[in-house]
Amino acid sequence: MAAAAAELVIGWCIFGLLLLAILAFCWVYVRKYQSQRESEVVSTVTAIFSLAVALITSALLPVDIFLVSYMKNQNGTFKDWADANVTVQIENTVLYGYYTLYSVILFCVFFWIPFVYFYYEEKDEDDASKCTQIKTALKYTLGFVVICALLLLVGAFVPLHLPNNNNSTEWEKVKLLFEDLGTGQGLAALSFSISSLTLIGMLAAITYTAYGMSALPLNLIKGTRSTAYERLENTEDIEEVEQHIQTIRSKSKDGRPLPARDRRALKQCEERLRTLRKRERHLEFIENSWWTKFCGALRPLKIIWGIFFILVALLFVISLFLSNLDKALHSAGIDSGFIIFGTNLSNPLNMLLPLLQTVFPLDYILITIIIMYFIFTSMAGIRNIGIWFFWIRLYKIRRGRTRPQALLFLCMILLLIVLHTSYMIYSLAPQYVMYGSQNYLIESNITSDAHKGNSTLAVPKRCDADAPKDQCTVTRTYIFLHKFWFFSAAYYFGNWAFLVVFLIGLIVSCCKGKKSVIEGVDEDSDLSDDEPSAYSA
């Protein structure tokens, strides 16, 4: 029992250290992007807290896999301390952790974030009192609460029975597996709600992460345009516009009023001239900035990072393609959510993670790197694309200039994407997420020359769906991911869409030219002349 407690403490201590690192990362990340002029304490705390909860939930995945793996020896036998009661206790500890964190996520998504968002939307109205702002925000938030309640009710009572197919032995495996996942109504309701959010996260990942995986490394490799060259172009544009303004004004030297067409052209030229002079001030500031010189010295390092990121992206894409192809060829079909038994087509990550798990916490570190990679590539995609509602651009994400409402939208999108990363990791390494490094014993017949006959020997085999129910423990993560087969089917098709969008994004990123060092300065209507430092960072 003491050994069991020691193993449990090791896993949770690593989780605790990672929790502190997550909180520090979220604080730095949110503070980096929030507007310095419109900073609000409540929106900042909400953004940090919601993003941290999502990352902490993802951090439970390697803990879950670690605990089920450490119940067994590599020879396929259970450890001495891993009796039935201890095993159930460990599983319940992780399950209650998921219950708590997923409940907090539902609270953030369906109540707290919408309330804070609508509160600041009403705050923009100068004549609205604080009481009116709260009432209006609660009124709009009530709609989200109703949606959450409906999802919980549907999840609690939706039928989980799979279609019958008596002619296939695979169906028997699927039925037994789903029976093993439990039938609690509370678990079903929570799983349905979280799966619905994960489905939205899948759409966000297809839109932002897939594009960011190609845009981020190629932008690092290509770099930005030369500041001196941009200043030269800008100076030529200023001279051209000034000359055009003088030409228009010369038409009224004799006192005659300008025609309406010329007045409109003059107004447009004056606006253009103000914008160009504003660009000139920012370009001059950036050219003389020590930060620009420092970044120039780091240019070779950025190229190396870009090459590394594109190689990692190709590794993920190849692994995801092989995993999806394996499901297409060998799964139990769409009505089972494309559940696959065993691995017929191995991919690099599916082979690497079980090997790293033998030296704890190497697999923990790799999963953390994968999650952070998805965060950074998603952020790159959001910064390049912006936040849109169909064809209407709602917000731009700018370093040091993101409004409180946009910051909440940003963290909401990242929260949903992080939720989806658990399924992405499962797609990349299904056997690892389901059973970790567990083995079980099977009887194998061998021929012995000494005894001139056959003998039976128990040999270890990697856990899969063919293993006896009492020999392999399924992770609690897998329960939440596959409680409803139709969500798994949607994720499967979403993975193909992810691959297509990545390829499209790769082509677009290759065709696009270098970015300006002050990209977005022309679009930012709130850009003041005394704050050029935001674009020098």
Swiss-Prot record:
Residues 1-7, 69-97, 163-185, 324-361, 427-483 are extracellular. The modification Phosphoserine is found at S525, S528. Glycans are attached at N75, N85, N166, N167, N344, N445, N454. The keyword Cell membrane applies. A motif (WTKF motif) lies at residues 291-294. N-glycosylated. Residues 29-47, 119-141, 207-302, 383-405, 505-537 are cytoplasmic. It is a multi-pass membrane protein. One of its GO terms (molecular function) is cobalamin binding. The modification Phosphothreonine is found at T235. It is found in: Endoplasmic reticulum membrane; Lysosome membrane; Cell membrane; Cytoplasmic vesicle, Clathrin-coated vesicle. One of its GO terms (biological process) is gastrulation. A motif (YERL motif) lies at residues 229-232. One of its GO terms (cellular component) is clathrin-coated endocytic vesicle. InterPro entries: LMBD1_LysCbl_Transport, LMBR1-like_membr_prot. The chain crosses the membrane at residues 8-28, 48-68, 98-118, 142-162, 186-206, 303-323, 362-382, 406-426, 484-504. Keywords: Cell membrane, Cobalamin, Cobalt, Cytoplasmic vesicle, Developmental protein, Endocytosis, Endoplasmic reticulum, Gastrulation, Glycoprotein, Lysosome, Membrane, Phosphoprotein, Transmembrane, Transmembrane helix, Transport. Disruption phenotype: Early embryonic lethality. Embryos show an impaired initiation of gastrulation. Lysosomal membrane chaperone required to export cobalamin (vitamin B12) from the lysosome to the cytosol, allowing its conversion to cofactors. Targets ABCD4 transporter from the endoplasmic reticulum to the lysosome. Then forms a complex with lysosomal ABCD4 and cytoplasmic MMACHC to transport cobalamin across the lysosomal membrane. Acts as an adapter protein which plays an important role in mediating and regulating the internalization of the insulin receptor (INSR). Involved in clathrin-mediated endocytosis of INSR via its interaction with adapter protein complex 2. Interacts with ABCD4; this interaction induces the translocation of ABCD4 from the endoplasmic reticulum to the lysosome. Interacts with ABCD4 and MMACHC; this interaction ensures the transport of cobalamin from the lysosome to the cytoplasm. Interacts with INSR, adapter protein complex 2 and clathrin heavy chain. Belongs to the LIMR family. LMBRD1 subfamily. This is Lysosomal cobalamin transport escort protein LMBD1. It comes from Mus musculus (Mouse).
